[in-house]
Swiss-Prot record:
There is a cross-link at residues 426, 675 (Glycyl lysine isopeptide (Lys-Gly) (interchain with G-Cter in SUMO2)). It comes from the Eukaryota. The keyword Lipid biosynthesis does not apply. The gene is Wdr75. This is WD repeat-containing protein 75. Ribosome biogenesis factor. Part of the small subunit (SSU) processome, first precursor of the small eukaryotic ribosomal subunit. During the assembly of the SSU processome in the nucleolus, many ribosome biogenesis factors, an RNA chaperone and ribosomal proteins associate with the nascent pre-rRNA and work in concert to generate RNA folding, modifications, rearrangements and cleavage as well as targeted degradation of pre-ribosomal RNA by the RNA exosome. Involved in nucleolar processing of pre-18S ribosomal RNA. Required for optimal pre-ribosomal RNA transcription by RNA polymerase I. Keywords: Isopeptide bond, Nucleus, Phosphoprotein, Repeat, Ribosome biogenesis, rRNA processing, Transcription, Transcription regulation, Ubl conjugation, WD repeat. InterPro entries: Quinoprotein_ADH-like_sf, WD40/YVTN_repeat-like_dom_sf, WD40_repeat_dom_sf, WD40_rpt, WDR75.
């Protein structure tokens, strides 16, 4: 087979909450930025319908085209504005602006002009400019003529708003509010007190929103207050009123379409609706899960949506009832558990919300569910010391899950708990089995299960800074009836009071390797006797893993000083070593390959090798500009068939890695979106739409029609081809009219697709309904004659040979007479 080059692709994990989400005009779709992609979701099914990719840097703004509601604009840090057909996921046009674009606005009555936030030459200084997008038939258009509007603004789009149908624009930064009137070409500036006393220290502006119909500006502040500004046409006569409910900073504001209500959100995880600008008349939607960062309103006014700090988008009905949740990969402060794979669901498992493990589908790029480990109510307070989930590991094909949580207010007060969870087939989830308080006297640095199939009972090993590693086994004597099972400590090991840093089992489970700072110890898992030690004196051991399959006799280790070592367990000596600053080392559980990601001055480099050979099989430089923190091999549902030795490591597993900014990347030959044609994307979109009464009736009709066709085909000599299976007709019916070629070009293709091929035999005895009534007597009278004619034709065919094949029977002549009566004059109209 012809193999394509392996390249790094973003497979998910990008921030969905980087900018405000945008609704389509009919509220069927919601658009959100996701790294350098734009994702199109269904508001009812929560499924991703399309992924719009074409930008080379982060997408910083999206808006529906006011001139064509089936099109979407997007701007990016790459300095371009792209116009999309979001129904089919097609890029229509690219406008090259030049500078880095931070925000994007299209007010009413803009007349092909858009407003952009760009950076000046000075750091942290931004401008609001306008640019006219020229009308051109070319797909790549340059629009570099920028018109200055406002200076010294905040780059966040939440700090700029257009009001009263685009008559003015309001911008806030620090303690200043600026209002620019387009007709008057005048700017009014307003300032709040900014003294250092406690009363005025939190007057700083955080966001702004403008009333769609009236001259009213709403601003949010650090102290949780909302100010409604009026009479701001003059610097002296302005007034404002205060609304106060939030105890912390107001994160975002949004007016409804009619302007009768104002929506606000903050760190309280509560959406507040202020009706008629009154503090007494407000409604709440509480317990949204995490801080609200953005608020959006649909053009029809029937839906709201909130973007949250845990990379989640919540779709809300007008009556403040949450209807859908689009959950991305949760961005935790630190991924201390690393990347794991659930053996049952093949989902990616890592830290999620505080105190939770998230199970994330790599195929669907969405969260499956959260597992609450700490089981405590989370209090959003920066000064409060939270209980953190630090370690986790799966064992026994996903039957057991071990987690470690800790809380430490100071160096001398450490709260440590280890929990063992058992998978319940009845509840289809993990149930807490054993909770162990203070399993070690210091922080737990590593834990691992013995997953060898030869061992009937599971074994868990934990390593700690207290200088010990402990072996935990499952016992059934936790009560007098011996019906309950629980985990208990079976063995405690140490080595010269060094801190234990890593631990891992061999593939067959017979050996346990535990690293104590710079020394690696090998233990017999049956008797827990120390077999041998390896001392490389090249720094503390950072990673430790055994080889697999043909390389099971090797042990790999990396050090803090940038040394990669390979030891031979049979000869108890070092096999080879290399100078490599390895940050991530992961063995493939389904092959003998090992992936190592090393940090260099230019970025992160990938090395794939076998422990038996010091020469790497595959090297790819600069897989990421930033540091790679975690990696994991995920088994494929359908194995690949790469024949090249450099690509065989991708056959059974796929390597995923997580960067410092928590972007999830992988290696592939082709992205999933590139494998889809526009027609198949449209079909996918239709399949993701909800089942309506009409579609239910239509589906039953199609099933009945298909059953009739099946019954008819059993009695017919030949079945006519169905139009659903003809590519030309499918393409014509499912492609939007505005992207189709001219009718004259499609006519010949469409008509030819309806014609029968030469190889298809004509049906002999399938009369029409009309013909059954009109020619009933004729068929009866000619039945005997047809049989006689067929006998004669059979005898003549024997004598005449091929010449007899071209003679027509009586029934065939009748079929031809039917076709002569058909009116084909409609073809001339095309």
């Amino acid at each position: 087979m012809v193999e394509e080059g392996v390249r790094v692709v973003r497979c998910g994990g990008s921030r969905l909450n980087f900018r405000r989400a945008v609704f389509s005009v009919d509220s069927k779709y919601i658009f959100c930025v996701s790294g350098d992609f734009v994702k199109v979701y269904s508001t009812t099914t929560e499924e991703c319908v399309h992924i719009l990719h074409g930008h080379t840097d982060l997408v910083s703004g999206i808006l529906v085209n006011p001139s064509n509601h089936l099109q979407l604009y997007s701007c990016s840090f790459d300095g371009t504005i792209k116009l999309w057909d979001y129904v089919d996921g097609i890029l229509i046009k690219t406008f090259t602006i030049g500078p880095k674009l931070h925000a994007f606005f299209i007010p009413l009555h803009a007349e092909d002009s858009v407003f952009l936030t760009i950076s000046k030459e000075e750091p942290d200084i931004f401008q609001l400019v306008s640019v006219k997008l020229p009308k051109s038939t070319s797909q790549d258009v340059e629009a570099r003529q920028l018109t200055f509007v406002l200076d010294y603004i905040n780059r966040s789009p939440k700090c700029i708003a257009f009001g009263n149908e685009g008559e003015y624009v309001a911008a806030v930064r620090d303690f200043y509010l600026s209002v620019y009137f387009f007709k008057k070409k005048k700017t009014c500036n307003f300032t709040l007190p900014s003294t250092k006393n406690k009363k005025n220290a939190k007057n700083k502006f955080t966001c702004v929103a403008c009333h769609p119909k009236e001259d009213c500006i709403a601003s949010g502040h650090m102290d949780g207050k909302i100010r409604l500004w009026r009479n701001f046409h003059s610097d002296q006569k302005y007034t404002y009123t205060c609304l106060h409910w939030h105890h912390d900073m107001v994160m975002d504001l949004a007016f409804t379409v009619t302007g009768t209500s104002l929506l606000s959100g903050g760190r309280e995880c509560v959406l507040v609706e202020w009706r008629d600008g009154s503090e007494k008349n407000k409604e709440f939607l509480p317990r949204l899960g995490s801080s609200i960062e953005h608020i959006s309103v649909s053009p029809a006014g029937d839906l709201f949506c909130t973007s949250h700090s845990d990379n989640k988008i919540t779709v809300i009905h007008r009556n403040l009832d949450a209807s859908a949740v689009i959950q991305g990969l949760v961005k935790d402060r630190s991924i201390s558990t690393g990347l794991m794979v659930d053996p049952r669901t093949k989902a990616l498992v890592l830290n999620g919300k505080p105190g939770h493990l998230q199970f994330y589908s790599l195929q669907g790029d969405k969260q499956l569910y959260n597992l609450d480990i700490i089981q405590q109510e989370y209090i959003n307070d920066e000064g409060l010391t939270q209980t953190e989930l630090t370690k986790a590991a799966f064992g026994c094909s996903g039957t057991w899950l071990a987690t470690v949580e800790q809380r430490q207010e100071n160096e001398n007060e450490l709260e440590l708990q280890m929990k063992l969870w058992n998978y319940s087939k009845k509840t289809q989830g993990f149930v807490l089995n054993t909770k162990i308080a203070m399993p070690h006297d210091d922080h737990i640095t590593a834990l691992c299960f013995n997953n060898a199939e030869s061992y009937e009972k599971p074994i868990l090993v934990t390593a700690s800074r207290d200088g010990h590693f402990k072996v935990w086994i499952l016992t059934d004597d936790s009560d007098i009836y011996k019906k309950a099972i629980a985990w208990t400590c079976d063995f405690v090991g140490s080595y010269h009071k060094y801190q234990a840093t890593n631990c891992c089992f061999s593939e067959d489970g017979s050996l346990l390797a535990v690293s104590f700072e710079e020394i690696v110890t090998i233990w017999d898992s049956q008797t827990w006797e120390l077999k041998c030690t390896f001392c490389q004196r090249a720094g503390k051991i950072r990673h430790l893993c055994f080889g697999r399959l043909t390389c099971s006799k090797y042990l790999l280790g990396t050090t803090d000083n940038g040394i990669l070592c390979c030891w031979n367990l049979l000869s108890c000596s070092i096999q080879w070593s290399a100078k490599l600053n390895v940050r991530v080392m992961e063995p493939d559980p389904y092959s003998d390959h090992v992936a190592a990601v090393a940090q260099s001055s230019a970025g992160s480099d990938l090395f794939v090798f076998k422990p038996s050979e010091p020469r790497p099989l595959y090297i790819q430089k600069n897989v990421s500009r930033e540091e790679v923190q975690w990696g994991v091999f995920v088994p494929r549902d359908v194995p690949e068939s790469f024949t090249s030795e450099t690509h065989q490591w991708l056959n059974r597993s796929q390597f995923y890695f997580l960067t410092k900014s928590q972007s999830l990347l992988t290696f592939s030959t082709k992205s999933p979106e590139e494998k889809l044609t526009p027609t198949s994307k449209q079909l996918l979109a239709e399949e993701s739409l909800p089942t309506t009464p009409f579609s239910f009736i239509l589906g039953k009709h199609r099933q009945q029609q298909g059953a009739k066709l099946t019954e008819t085909s059993e009695n017919e000599l030949v079945q006519l081809p169905l139009t659903e299976n003809i590519p030309a007709i499918t393409e014509l019916l499912h492609t939007p009219a505005h992207v189709l070629p001219s009718a004259s070009f499609l006519c010949s293709l469409f008509v030819n697709s309806l014609l029968l091929s030469k190889e298809t035999k004509s049906a002999e005895e399938v009369p029409d309904d009309v013909d059954m009534e009109g020619n009933k007597e004729s068929d009866d009278s000619d039945e005997e004659y047809d049989l006689t004619e067929k006998d004669k034709e059979t005898n003549n065919n024997t004598d005449l040979g091929e010449d007899a094949i071209h003679q027509l029977s009586k029934s065939e002549e009748k079929e031809l007479r039917k076709f002569r009566k058909v009116d084909y004059s409609w073809l001339t109209a095309l």
